[in-house]
From Swiss-Prot:
Protein name per the record: Chaperone protein IpgC
Source species, domain of life: Bacteria
Subcellular location field: Cytoplasm
Species assigned in the record: Shigella flexneri
Gene3D superfamilies attached to this UniProt entry: Tetratricopeptide repeat domain
Amino acid sequence: MSLNITENESISTAVIDAINSGATLKDINAIPDDMMDDIYSYAYDFYNKGRIEEAEVFFRFLCIYDFYNVDYIMGLAAIYQIKEQFQQAADLYAVAFALGKNDYTPVFHTGQCQLRLKAPLKAKECFELVIQHSNDEKLKIKAQSYLDAIQDIKE
């Protein structure tokens, strides 16, 4: 099947219009939610079994096809954190926080990444935000533990 230039331009325009209106590749390709859930299950299973490279492939796919799903972004961020790619992880955690609104889990993990990036003041800001704004008491306790541990560190 060959497409002429006009057909290619029409398809390109339709895809760009769809993306500009907020559609994801999942939507454009009509991938059902249950299929995405199955792929997520594989990614999560690989992650839990320590098969990080395989998990990364699946989480990358999920993020590319549905960049609005916080679980997919958190999964890929966790992979980067495990692989000690802390700046990439922190960047993805920031996206997850922006999409997730009131869930401060990504902010907590950003704080962990900032510590590993040797930026204790940034880490402190993250942990303080968690304590001030999170509704998750367990997460607040963890954040306070980090704050207590780094209280005397200067950048």
